[in-house]
């Protein structure tokens, strides 16, 4: 075996059981954190944060806060590649990614408690100061959560350069992510209701309950981030040595825009993410204001939770025989069926439950295909442009999720205000116009986006397992022959 192959075997080898478990744990809290921020924070804002205000003033404040969230998140979209470049240029004895798991997990966990507490009651004391501090806090929170998210998924190519081994790590992260994301949906109302009653003796979802919910999410996020920080170890290879010199942010942006496969995968995933997060973001309103079945809302967490248990481990097994392109396509077709049923039968609970199965079950296949395609585009970009940008490339997915989250926040706020689904409103108050507005935002617009996502992926995304294997082989040959020259890469090969 050549020295080159010895070097590359470090990054190709299968990770130990402990490392796999530690890595998998990370997305449990990270996904729960994301769902709390992208979905339930706006639910908290529209239903509880301004409950002591007059109806007119509360509506104004809801519009202001949800608008600010959308603006902040869209603005920070352009920061994510810079954060990826920061991670790529991090050099510590812990490696490139683990320090940001430690720091990002700590800071974001502290700040999420702050925003779910109404800035510790400041919202009811000084509205202007509350808005100012909220903007600052939300920006800092979003930045440090992004650093955690980018470093988590950016770690995959540091663990293996083999496409199938990467799918194992991706499956583990997606599996626990499904538990965290959907588990929050299952427990949010019971937790908020329980702690509201415990601290105030009142029924419903009050401030004390939402603050307790924020604290639980923060604790889970901190523990799981630190599990990754202390439980994993990055590998080295000639391929990864190219990433040691990542240059300035301008070069990072240039590398992204020159990687055509990255851009097409990103566009397809963006269309999916916007559709998916908008719909999941307004599910609470479907059960409360359309179906008038708030007690059944937990089904929107139970179905995807069970689906995650089955589909995430199944993906790498099926992917050994079925190309991920077809797994992605099958998932999209299932979602189209689900959307159609939801749009036509949104007031029929049994049909809605069946539709939710079609909607939620394929999520793992779609998301894992996108993540793996983005990950494999790292070597594609390295071969095409001569630069390897791991964290910068993989910062694209969190950036796209952030766009989806911003759209979800905006859509939830718009639906709540336009359809009168705020404050003490009930299902009995809803009119046909209210329901039509809801269905347009929740189902019809996302359905169009899902169809467009499938079209882009099928006709523009070319990178697959076979193509990636050929790229890695060609890269290794060029590094060994000196056709691609990099001092640190050659040092790894020689050693």
Predicted segments — roles?
Residues 2-495:
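Membrane-embedded alpha-helical bundles of multi-pass transporters/translocases
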């Amino acid at each position: 075996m050549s020295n080159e192959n010895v070097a590359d075997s470090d990054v190709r080898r299968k990770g130990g059981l402990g490392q796999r478990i530690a890595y998998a744990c990370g997305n449990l809290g990270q996904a729960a954190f994301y769902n709390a921020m992208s979905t339930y924070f706006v639910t908290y804002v529209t239903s509880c944060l301004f409950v002591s205000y007059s109806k007119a003033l509360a509506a104004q404040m809801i519009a202001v806060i949800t608008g600010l969230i959308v603006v902040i998140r869209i603005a920070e979209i352009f920061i994510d590649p810079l954060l990826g470049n920061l991670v790529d240029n991090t050099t510590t004895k812990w490696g490139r990614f683990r320090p940001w798991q430690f720091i990002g997990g700590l800071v974001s966990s502290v700040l999420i408690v702050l925003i779910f507490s109404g800035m510790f009651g400041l919202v009811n004391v000084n509205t202007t100061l509350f808005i100012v501090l909220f903007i600052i806090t939300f920006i800092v929170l979003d930045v440090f959560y992004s650093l955690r998210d980018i470093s988590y998924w950016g770690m995959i190519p540091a663990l293996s350069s083999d496409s199938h081994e990467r799918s194992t790590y991706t499956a583990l992260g997606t599996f626990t992510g499904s538990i965290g994301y959907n588990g929050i949906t299952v427990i949010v109302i019971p937790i908020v209701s329980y702690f509201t009653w415990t601290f105030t003796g009142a029924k419903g979802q009050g401030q004390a309950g939402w603050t307790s919910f924020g604290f639980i999410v923060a604790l889970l996020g901190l523990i799981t981030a630190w599990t990754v920080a202390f439980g994993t170890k990055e590998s080295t290879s000639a391929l990864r040595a190219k990433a040691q010199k990542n240059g300035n942010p301008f070069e990072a942006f240039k590398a992204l825009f020159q990687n055509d496969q990255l851009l097409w995968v990103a566009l397809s995933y963006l269309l999916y993410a916007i559709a998916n997060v908008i719909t999941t973001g307004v599910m609470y309103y479907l059960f409360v204001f359309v179906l008038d079945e708030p007690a059944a809302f937990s089904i929107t967490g139970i179905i995807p939770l069970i689906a995650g248990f089955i589909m995430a481990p199944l993906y790498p097994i099926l992917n050994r025989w079925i190309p991920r392109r077809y797994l992605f396509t099958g998932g999209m077709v299932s979602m189209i069926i689900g959307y159609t049923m939801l749009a036509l039968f949104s007031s029929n609970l049994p049909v809605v439950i069946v539709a939710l199965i079609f909607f939620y079950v394929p999520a793992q296949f779609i998301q894992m295909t996108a993540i793996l395609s983005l990950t494999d585009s790292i070597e594609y970009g390295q071969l095409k442009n001569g630069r390897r940008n791991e964290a910068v490339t993989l910062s694209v997915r969190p950036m796209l999720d952030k766009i989806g989250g911003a759209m979800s926040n905006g859509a939830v706020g718009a639906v709540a205000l336009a359809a009168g689904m705020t404050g003490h409103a009930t299902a009995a108050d809803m009119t046909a116009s209210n329901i039509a507005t809801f269905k347009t935002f929740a189902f019809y617009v996302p359905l169009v986006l899902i169809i467009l996502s499938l079209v882009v992926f099928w006709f523009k995304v070319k990178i697959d397992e076979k193509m990636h294997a050929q790229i890695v082989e060609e890269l290794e040959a060029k590094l060994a022959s000196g056709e691609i020259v990099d001092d640190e890469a050659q040092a790894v090969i020689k050693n």
